[in-house]
Design a protein with these regions (language model features):
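Aromatic "clamp/platform" in nucleotide-sugar-dependent glycosyltransferases that forms part
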Residues: 252
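A charged, aromatic-enriched C-terminal amphipathic alpha-helix characteristic of glycosyltransferases
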Residues: 303-333
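Donor nucleotide-sugar binding/catalytic pocket of nucleotide-sugar-dependent glycosyltransferases
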Residues: 124-170
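Acidic anion/phosphate-binding donor-loop and adjacent secondary structure
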Residues: 162-180, 218
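Conserved donor-binding/catalytic core segment of Leloir-type glycosyltransferases
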Residues: 8, 174-204, 208
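Short alpha-helical donor nucleotide-sugar binding micro-motif in glycosyltransferases
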Residues: 130, 231-232, 239-244, 325
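Short hydrophobic beta-strand element within catalytic cores of glycosyltransferases
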Residues: 269-272
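Nucleotide-activated donor-binding/catalytic signature segment of Leloir-type glycosyltransferases, i.e.
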Residues: 217-235
Length: 333
């Protein structure tokens, strides 16, 4: 008889971000191994868009206990710290049920960048949210240490990510352009530090911005030399990775950055700042280059062997990510 995993999330299934991508791939592996996966997300409740950040949904969860009884899960995983995650956490703590959680997003840094909220106010809330979790899954060893530095004292586990190799693979017989092509894939929003990419002045380079978001029209007006191609997924997205000579990752506050390993799987080296996310993902001088001067990182990355970049991406596997997720589930009782 298959066991049921309940994933509690404040993301809708049709959203496109690293968190949703992670769980879709984990779900596929779980189903293959005879697990049943059920989501408790804002779609089950009334919700509104977060002002200024429409991709974030603010739900108003009700009758959580009844929903949990109907689902009857063997394991509960709380993926996000939003209203749905919070309400379920409160119910589980009140009734003595066990669960694990995940820390995917640097909310304290994000809230500071977007709304000016001091991190000293938000880190205690994040720490409190995960306090009773049987296991806290986060992206890398570096993030494990960061959470511990902020007072997390539970069992924290590094949880890797993977790549769909059926979609993200190197170009086959397609000549690269003589003009350097620099591609960035991201939500087009303030906190992503995209100006660092958009303002790059690498001689002769063609810059392509893939993605959508609240700053898109503003950036399109301010940076007419950049090609803004909008939102892309699947094979269409992979085509942009493959056509790039360098994938530029300007963000300084990611916990991981799945787009980097998708680019690597396509044989495209990454240029980034030496900060969390890139430091854990990039093999310096093999799959990418890091430098506080992003233009220099691009220049160095252009010299890398695309075959070695692709080979270096082999360590990222959804099967491995699923094994870590599965092995750190906790029984609800």
């Amino acid at each position: 008889m298959s066991k049921t995993i309940l994933i509690v999330t404040d993301n809708l299934p049709d959203q496109i971000n690293g968190v949703v991508t992670t769980y879709k791939n984990i779900e596929a592996c779980a189903i293959r191994d005879n697990y049943r996966v059920v989501y408790l997300d804002p779609g089950r409740f009334r919700y509104v868009d977060c002002p200024g950040y429409n991709e974030v949904k603010i739900a108003f969860p009700r009758k959580v206990g009844k929903i949990l009884e109907e689902i009857c899960p063997d394991h509960i995983h709380i993926a996000t710290e939003g209203p749905v995650g919070l309400r379920v956490r409160q119910y589980l703590d009140k009734h003595g049920y066990r669960y694990n959680t995940a820390y995917h997003t640097k909310f304290p840094e994000g809230l500071r960048a977007l709304f000016g909220i001091p991190e000293k106010l938000t880190w205690p809330l994040v720490r409190w949210f995960h306090k009773h979790s049987g296991k806290v899954l986060t992206t890398t060893d570096t993030m494990v240490q960061e959470l511990k530095s902020h007072g997390f004292d539970g069992d924290i586990v590094p949880w890797t990510r993977g790549v769909d190799r059926d979609i993200f693979y190197p170009a086959r017989g397609i000549a690269q352009s003589k003009r350097p092509v620099l591609v960035c894939v991201s939500r087009v929003s303030k906190e992503k530090n995209l100006e660092a990419f958009l303002e790059l002045e690498y001689a002769g380079a063609r810059k392509i911005m893939v993605g959508d978001g609240p700053m898109l029209e503003d950036y399109r007006t301010r940076y007419p030399d950049v090609e803004f191609v909008g939102f892309k997924t699947g094979r269409n997205l992979a085509d942009y990775y493959r056509m790039a000579d360098v994938f530029v990752f300007p963000s300084r506050w990611e916990t991981f950055g799945i787009v980097m390993i998708e680019a690597m799987a396509c044989g495209t080296p990454v240029a980034a700042y030496p900060c969390q996310g890139p430091l854990d993902v990039i093999d310096e001088g093999i799959t990418g280059c890091m430098n506080n001067d992003l233009e220099q990182a691009v220049e160095d990355a252009l010299m890398l062997d695309r075959q070695l970049v692709h080979r270096g991406s082999a360590r990222w596997s959804w099967d491995r990510a699923w094994a870590i997720f599965r092995d750190n589930l906790v029984d609800i009782k």
